[in-house]
């Protein structure tokens, strides 16, 4: 597992580059805990199965392409901000494809953080404040009903490794 303080600092730095409203205490904690639960900050490729999900936040490439095409495309200022925060060429946002994003999500930690935050930003609800609220929010909007995770496992992982 990576050094917790360093991971939090990188998350803070990336989210600050996206803007103050993306870097609240709640956002930083939710993004940090999501990565912790998804990978323990150990795995860059989905363990077992087909290795579809990538990065510490276990984001599927199609999820990033969807976020770009159906969310960021309608928020060009935010799209530019995300590209800059992730240190990515604009072409990955103007013509996104899964192959490029598979590589980006495996190798670019700033892009992983930014896309995790964008994923949560799309949710039309306030960010959770408590660990239990985070666990349910993560399950409902990140891991989803189809995912193997549970709110109880989220809380357990954060208490054990966080």
Regions inferred by a protein language model and the residue ranges of each:
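Short amphipathic alpha-helical interaction patches enriched in hydrophobic/aromatic residues
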Residues: 19, 123-124, 142
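Alpha-helical scaffolds flanking conserved acidic
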Residues: 25-33, 130-138
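Short, charged helix-capping/linker segments at alpha-helix termini
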Residues: 17-26
